[in-house]
Structures are given as C-alpha cells and as structure tokens.
C-alpha cells in the first residue's frame, strides 16, 4: 500500500480539538502503523504552516488520495490546496464526512462537495478524481493470470 499520512487538527486551549483531549484523539481503528506519519495543523489547509509539503516532496509523491472529517472545512480546503500545489488529487467520495449545519444536512454537504470537486476545472485540463472506497480497493488488486 502507499504511505499514509494522518493529518490532525490542533485547536487552541479550551477548543473541541485541544491536543490531548478526548475529542482530539484519533479513533482507535485509525492508529498510525509503522512507517506512517502524522502532521498536526492549526488551519483548515493541511499544507499551511505544516511539514506536509516537505514530507511529500521527500518521498517524491505526486498523487494524493484524500479522505477525512469536516468535508466543508478541512477536507475541501485541503483538496483545493493539494490541487493548487500541483498534485494529482483523488478523493474518496464515501470517505469524508461532516456534521449537519444550520442550513444543510451533512448528507447534502457531502453530496454538494462531491459534485463540486468532480466539476472543478484546474489548469492544464487537470481534474480531481472521485472514487468510492470499493472502486479504489478493486483498482488496487493485482491482476491474476491463469
């Protein structure tokens, strides 16, 4: 598999995502494995004032597969920033989530962002690719010849 980089948001003291608090902890099923990295950020953009770009350049990464929490904030901002940094961006359309907002349900927000990313035009004819998790796993299976 490819390298996994866990991006974790750090809030100010007293915030929901204050480092060390229960809300900040990664889900037990999402613990980094040996060789994975963790990047901590304080803004929606995972590239802004973090070591993410350096880690990716160090490994000669040119394609990112993105998933995560807060579709309408951190995920959207990072998708756009990754594209602006010239990466080939693939988003797991069933691999990002958010909460209901006063004006839209979480489901509507996710549907809107999947549509928007699919139709976002980038320089040089590049596009953001959206796949389901099943499609990604199917594409990653080695071909068998008998």
Q: Can you annotate each of these PLM segments?
A:
Residues 15-146:
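Active-site-adjacent betaalpha module
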């Amino acid at each position: 598999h490819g390298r996994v980089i866990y991006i974790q948001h750090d809030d100010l003291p007293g915030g929901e995502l204050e480092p060390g608090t229960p809300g900040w902890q990664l889900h037990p099923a999402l613990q980094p494995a040996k060789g994975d990295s963790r990047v901590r950020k304080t803004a929606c953009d995972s590239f802004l004032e973090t070591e993410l770009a350096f880690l990716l350049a160090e490994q000669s990464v040119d394609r990112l597969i993105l998933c995560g929490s807060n579709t309408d904030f951190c995920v959207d901002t990072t998708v756009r920033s990754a594209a602006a940094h010239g990466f080939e961006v693939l988003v797991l359309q069933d691999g990002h989530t958010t909460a209901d907002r006063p004006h839209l349900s979480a489901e509507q927000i996710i549907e809107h962002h999947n549509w928007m990313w699919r139709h976002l035009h980038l320089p040089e004819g590049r596009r953001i690719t959206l796949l389901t998790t099943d499609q990604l796993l199917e594409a990653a299976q080695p071909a068998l010849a008998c």
